[in-house]
């Protein structure tokens, strides 16, 4: 399981049924393409603003070299992330 820390950016919906989203995690060294298939987690991430939040992501790589996110935490919480439940 890979743990990455960086800035959440370019959040997009891939599929609506079942809900699947992608986002770019920009670290100091590299940008990672991440996907989320868990509906509850994807719904919460869609409410976040691009380029504003520093996050920690745990997951594994799929065959397309994308990080499949299993755990997601916001490091710089504010009132919006607290309302959402991060």
Describe the function of each predicted region.
Residues 1-17:
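Structural detector for short beta-strands of small beta-barrel domains
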Residues 2-4, 21, 30-32, 51-55:
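A generic structural signal for short beta-strands and their flanking turns/coil linkers
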Residues 7, 24-26, 58-60:
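Residue-level recognition of well-ordered beta-strand positions that form the cores
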Residues 36-42, 73-76:
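A short, sequence-level motif marking secondary-structure junctions
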Residues 40-57:
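Short nucleic-acid-contacting surface segments enriched for D/E, G, S/T with interspersed K/R
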Residues 60-86:
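OB-fold/S1-family single-stranded nucleic acid-binding modules
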């Amino acid at each position: 399981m890979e743990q990455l820390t960086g800035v959440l950016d370019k959040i997009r919906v891939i599929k609506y049924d079942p809900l699947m989203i992608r986002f770019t995690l920009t670290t100091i060294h590299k940008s990672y393409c991440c996907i989320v298939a868990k509906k509850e987690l994807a719904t919460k991430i869609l409410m976040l603003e691009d380029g504003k939040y520093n996050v920690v992501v745990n997951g594994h790589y799929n065959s397309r070299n994308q990080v499949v996110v299993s755990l997601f935490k916001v490091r710089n919480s504010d009132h919006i992330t607290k309302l959402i439940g991060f």
